[in-house]
């Protein structure tokens, strides 16, 4: 039985992870749940259902949790509850392990606040099932430095899970993320697929008056609001490009993004001999989540497979870089300095929050990110303090640029 700590348990990744765990009794023991605090009743119900001994809440809501627990679980002993800005990182570091045997920390937090828990999990020696792409985008080399053993990170993003699996067709040299990742000399390029979001084929003029409800209507994936907006602007794909470069030690110039509206082929690896290995499955996050929890093993019957005996069509096309400049901004950021990706991410977080609150227009999101990125001078050390300083600068600059 594998010990699991789940961060972001009330979010999209977290709830689906608990679906996987519930569907495979006897294989996992949930040792801790962490959440921001926006859905205390759900968190208490999760803790009661899975007999969780430890709970971490980013907000100061211990009393609210106790009240919810009493209503849901009655006299059942309440788990240990820690609250505050350090609670999630402390929980993330509570498991230990080695390359031969370890528990798993699934980081399903959204945003750069996931960096400290990511570092804590790596330093503890636990396997890190990483859905919090922002950790890699802003943390860069700090992540590699914090790893306790080779292969400690298992990607949970569907694209990076696909790449890790496809890279297994290489020579199985050791790589940063998994026991299978590699064959660097054999790889010509990585191909990240994007659905194209709800605005594929639209012009910039078409996007001028886009509303939040329209942007949240993703054609193929069910995700949280921030990730869904990021997917619509394609900045999510820019962040994933940076993540892939770091995870798999591939030059960003050797990573291509293509639009695949069906969202069945989750990414591909093109080898130097001209062959391409792709990972395909219907769009269902339960699958990469399950693989992250059980890696290198596979769980039985996690999701329905592709219906190979049913007529179907897959299409691939280039994205419109003029309408969707976010991927280009990500390339510029990763080429500029080690701290520019942190600025890119922080500026985007501010802008997406403002858009969802109805305070700015849709096109203002990426336009403002571009202006903030251009104004950053790149000075500062690549350290945790340096990353946090760059993050804070970008947030302040974004608020100023938007007049907020």
Regions found by a protein language model. Name each.
Residues 1-404:
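Catalytic, metal-anchored helix/loop core of enzyme active sites in primary metabolism
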